[in-house]
Amino acid sequence: MYDCYNKSFPIKTKYVTVKRLHNAWLTSGILKSIKRKCNLFKMYKLGTVSHETFKQYRNYLTQIIRTAKINHYFQIFTNFRNNTKKIWQAINELKGNTNKVNNTKSLQYNNSILNDPSDISEAFSRYFSTIAPELDSKLPINNIEPKNYLKGNFLNSMMCPIVSTFDVATVIKSLNNKKSGINDISLSVIKRNSYLFAIPLTILFNQSVSTGTFPSLLKTAKITPIHKSGPDDDPKNYRPISQLTIFSKIFETLMKTYLIDYLENKNILNPSQYGFRRNRSTFQALNVFSNDVFSAIDKKHSVLSIFIDFAKAFDTVNHNILINKMHHYGIRGSILSWFKDYLKDRLQYTVFSGEKSSTTTVNLGVPQGSVLGPILFLIYINDISYLFSEAKSILFADDITLYLTGPNQNQIVQDANHELEKLHQWCLCNRLTINTKKTYFMLFTTKKYLI
């Protein structure tokens, strides 16, 4: 497929003149006014205009620029009020916050200071590939089988999907133009020739599912280190951003449609889960939580809330446990074999300052940056809410809120500790780690004297 693409759409080099990019609010009129201000300043220095004349024009221009900025960002916040990503981009732009990608000149790793980009790339690759295994190795062995926590009997199995050329072409057209793959393949070319590419991809996908195999060429991820905060020579202060091939995204999107339909139609997903689901959002989760808190306060009861955070939850998913849970929920046969192969023998490499590291094998976690990863994680964590008998739970993917209500605060605390112990045992069994540094509790009460 890649050879066919390269022969049909060879890369050609063309030199173009790139104009300097300006802020969106910077109009041609404002640019002319800025030049006019600079000229007035020179004239003031030469004594041909008064300081008052220059000052009046400078203040006038400052007001124009301030108004232009206000109008620009007001337009953004109005047009994209339902698009949180765009809103935060605008906020970060206003604050001057930008992600630092590969800006560091050196890296401290294993008591050494690395300066060569190729060495830094290898260090990032080793660091990112060892985070999850190190977390997993610190967990003690638990004798409880994960299947003991599973509820329900699912005798019927998920049907093996068969897609048409139209289905594949529709998926291709729906792909985000801003998200490219890792093989120098132009998404715009594929989208403009969607039906041409859909024909072989339809055959390949149907054969892939029927044989229970996922193409090995689609299992490699490119990792880019993105600086979060803190010293930029510490690898702990970087977030790995993963990119997969465009064809992998097409295959995964096709499978995701069938998988979600099956999970939702069979009511498999826990109703307390609000993450990555149709017609569910953080607003709904917050609404449920708020109503329960207000209802308890009206009864003069107290509410103890525990906000639980997992350490690298998506990256530490145990593949064998996940596959067994999928089998329990009716995902069997060639489809289950397809998911097994999808998770097996995945590779990743890191790119820093144009230098590519060697590849490393990934044996834990759902693939980062993938289409299927979030849905697979929902399956993995699906049985967690059935643990609790005294506490209510609200989940948004890996973020869990437990809360207990009642008139007696001491009893609430006792019940909460009991529920947390059950959660601890579940985590040991399912190889997940609670991040105690980011796990908090909050007490809602009208009582004057607290516990």
Model-flagged regions — what are they?
Residues 37-48, 404:
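Secondary-structure edge/capping motif, primarily at the C-terminal ends of alpha-helices
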Residues 128, 154-366:
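Conserved pre-catalytic core of RNA-dependent polymerases
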Residues 158, 354, 418, 433-451:
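Short, conserved micro-motifs composed of acidic
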Residues 255-273, 298, 374-404:
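Active-site palm subdomain of RNA-directed nucleic acid polymerases
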